[in-house]
């Protein structure tokens, strides 16, 4: 299972990329697109990607909160919230994400969505599930704190919906996910998205593809120097 920071995973690829994110973070969705653009520019680069939890609002009630009330309180006013989200919409359009913030009615607690992402790693469909959750929340306006929505997302990603329903119901891995979130903060992660490449290099925020490409080049340069005969 992904969660050791060093991460103890069987990475046999040329590069591993660990992504710390939250499922209600629009910049994480944008950052995913920018990373994908960088990877598309390097088609020969084999990567293994693992997603890790960071709850932006860990104290959110289990049932979530009314979206308008929550964002108005968070940003000081409904007008300020709209202004900020309009700016994010523009950033999303640049990477072909049609954010539909007006459609979102609930701001969910994201713990259960992170539990599901954890299980998706073992199922071999983690990246696909993250994409599905982003789409369902930011574009379709679904409540990704709702177990029915999470089960549907899991099924769409190819997971066993019966098993997922059982795991969600019995509270499996709640503490493990919370512990990993805490570990990320202890390592210095204070905002998301946060990308760790080969356990050595960090890219913080939804940076442009050029930032990832520069990191790829630095890693290749460093590894070539390490492998060079003395």
Please place each PLM-identified region on the residue numbering.
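Short cysteine clusters
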Residues: 25-28
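Acidic active-site catalytic centers that drive phospho-/nucleotidyl reactions
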Residues: 22
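C-terminal cap of thioredoxin/glutaredoxin-like
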Residues: 11, 17-19, 30-47, 51, ...
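Structural alpha/beta surface segment adjacent to cysteine/selenocysteine redox centers
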Residues: 33-140, 226-230
């Amino acid at each position: 299972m992904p969660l050791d920071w060093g991460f103890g995973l069987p990475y046999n690829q040329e590069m591993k990329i660990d992504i710390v994110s939250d499922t209600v973070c629009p910049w994480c969705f944008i950052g995913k697109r920018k990373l994908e653009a960088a990877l598309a520019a390097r088609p020969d680069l084999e990567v293994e990607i693992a997603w890790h939890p960071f709850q932006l609002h860990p104290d959110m009630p289990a049932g979530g909160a009314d979206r308008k009330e929550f964002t108005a309180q968070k940003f000081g006013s409904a007008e300020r919230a709209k202004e900020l989200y309009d700016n994010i919409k523009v950033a999303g359009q640049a990477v072909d994400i049609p954010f539909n913030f007006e459609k979102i009615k609930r701001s969910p607690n994201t713990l259960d969505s992170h539990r599901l992402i954890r299980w998706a790693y073992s199922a071999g469909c983690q990246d696909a599930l993250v994409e599905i959750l982003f789409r369902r929340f930011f574009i379709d306006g679904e409540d990704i704190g709702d177990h029915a929505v999470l089960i549907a997302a899991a099924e769409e990603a190819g997971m066993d919906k019966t098993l997922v329903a059982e795991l969600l119901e019995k509270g499996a891995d709640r503490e493990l996910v919370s512990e990993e979130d805490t570990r990320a903060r202890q390592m210095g992660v204070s905002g998301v998205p946060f990308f760790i490449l080969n356990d050595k290099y960090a890219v913080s925020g939804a940076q442009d593809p050029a930032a990832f490409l520069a990191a790829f080049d630095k890693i290749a340069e460093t590894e070539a120097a390490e492998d060079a005969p003395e």
